[in-house]
Amino acid sequence: MGNKQTVFTHEQLEAYQDCTFFTRKEIMRLFYRYQDLAPQLVPLDYTTCPDVKVPYELIGSMPELKDNPFRQRIAQVFSEDGDGHMTLDNFLDMFSVMSEMAPRDLKAYYAFKIYDFNNDDYICAWDLEQTVTKLTRGGLSAEEVSLVCEKVLDEADGDHDGRLSLEDFQNMILRAPDFLSTFHIRI
């Protein structure tokens, strides 16, 4: 009795529940996953809101991400500085957006950010080339990649400006019934 370690205050747990799609139990499970990545760095007591970031090298090596060709972009998009190093809040946000409970429009927004490699708020031909190359793990020739990108732009570029806006991307995602089932990470 009395030996129970307090990881979060009641208010912290409520706040995490309010801004994620997780239960208290899932939040605790994710905290321990985060802590296990860097036990020497991440304290078991978060009641004082420590300023801790787990390096990308550890985030990218997690079983949920290590085989994903977009692991670096995912980490960059969810990290506050864009460097892939994650605070606990970033880590919970990433898992929340990638959870099965997250709505399609939220997933589409983050997928768009992940595929926008040059961070200009559009997916241009270069961004598409990076995306196709990662998806095929370099298995297509430059000509084949270019052809795929051209077809995507022909199909999805609603205003014909040679790039995809978030709205263009969301309209394209609406026509992809398997998007929700593929854009997730199980916890």
UniProtKB/Swiss-Prot annotation:
Q: Where is the EF-hand domain?
A: 66-101, 103-138, 144-179
Binding residues for Ca(2+) 1, per the UniProt record?
A: D116, N118, D120, Y122, D127
InterPro entries xref list: CIBP, EF-hand-dom_pair, EF_Hand_1_Ca_BS, EF_hand_dom
Q: Does the keyword Transmembrane apply?
A: no
Instruction: Kindly state a single biological-process term from the GO annotations of this entry.
Output: calcium ion homeostasis
Output the PROSITE patterns linked to this UniProt entry.
EF_HAND_1 (PS00018), EF_HAND_2 (PS50222)
One GO term in the molecular function aspect is: calcium ion binding
Q: Name the keywords, alphabetized.
A: Calcium, Magnesium, Metal-binding, Repeat
CDD domains the record matches: EFh (cd00051)
Annotated positions binding Ca(2+) 2? D157, D159, D161, R163, D168
Q: What does this protein do?
A: Acts a an auxiliary subunit of the sensory mechanoelectrical transduction (MET) channel in hair cells. Plays a role in regulating hair cell MET channel localization and function.
Q: Which PANTHER family match?
A: CALCIUM AND INTEGRIN BINDING FAMILY MEMBER 2 (PTHR45791), CALCIUM AND INTEGRIN-BINDING FAMILY MEMBER 3 (PTHR45791:SF7)
Assembly and oligomerization: Monomer and homodimer. Interacts with ITGA2B (via C-terminus cytoplasmic tail region); the interaction is stabilized/increased in a calcium and magnesium-dependent manner. Interacts with TMC1.
Anything else known = The binding of either calcium or magnesium significantly increases the structural stability of the protein in comparison to apo-CIB (calcium- and magnesium-free form).
Q: What is this protein called?
A: Calcium and integrin-binding family member 3
- Species of origin reads Homo sapiens (Human)
